[in-house]
């Protein structure tokens, strides 16, 4: 019965975006939703960056390019209305510019993680959510035997 249920599970979705950094596709720090709109959390993913370039994960329009709290920030708006923000970055594109998927749009700057990384945030209808699905880094859920866990 469990095997049949497993076979009926939908496949893990494939990436719809390209990976925005060079080198290994590795999440250094995961998304953590805040418990309230202004509460603490981690509103994005930190991705390892083995090379200097930031690549556009999808096509869109640069909606912001500048500094926020002393860090370089670059935001793309997709045709679907998603906002993708990156920091810290030295932008190589300007506000209003159209960008293509895979285009070099910036240089990764130090200062966010102990090792080279870029923070990517995703907003949909004004709310932050994890960009794992678009990047294809979702992990399939696994059912574990109930006897391995204490209840209550």
Language model feature labels by segment:
Residues 2-73, 100-101, 129-133, 137-152:
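Surface-exposed, glycine-biased beta-strand/turn segments
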Residues 48, 77-79, 123:
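A generic structural motif
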Residues 51-54, 89-97:
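Short, surface-exposed secondary-structure edge patches
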Residues 57-92, 116-119:
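Zn2+-dependent peptidoglycan hydrolase active-site motif and core
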Residues 73-76, 99-120:
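Short hydrophobic beta/alpha edge segments that flank linear recognition/processing sites
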Residues 119-127:
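A short hydrophobic beta-strand segment most commonly corresponding to one strand
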């Amino acid at each position: 019965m469990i095997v049949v249920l497993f076979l009926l599970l939908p496949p893990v979705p494939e990436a719809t975006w390209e990976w925005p950094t060079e080198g290994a596709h590795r999440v250094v720090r995961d998304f953590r939703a805040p418990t309230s709109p202004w509460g603490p959390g981690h509103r994005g993913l930190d991705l390892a960056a083995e090379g200097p370039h930031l690549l556009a994960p999808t096509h869109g329009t640069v909606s912001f390019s500048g500094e926020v709290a002393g860090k370089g920030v670059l935001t793309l708006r997709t045709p679907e209305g998603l906002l993708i923000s990156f920091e810290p970055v030295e932008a190589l594109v300007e506000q209003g510019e159209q960008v293509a998927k895979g285009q070099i749009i910036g240089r990764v700057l130090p200062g966010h993680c102990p090792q080279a990384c870029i923070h990517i945030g995703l907003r949909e209808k004004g709310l932050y959510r994890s960009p794992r699905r678009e990047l294809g880094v979702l992990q399939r859920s696994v059912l574990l035997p109930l006897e391995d866990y204490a209840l209550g």
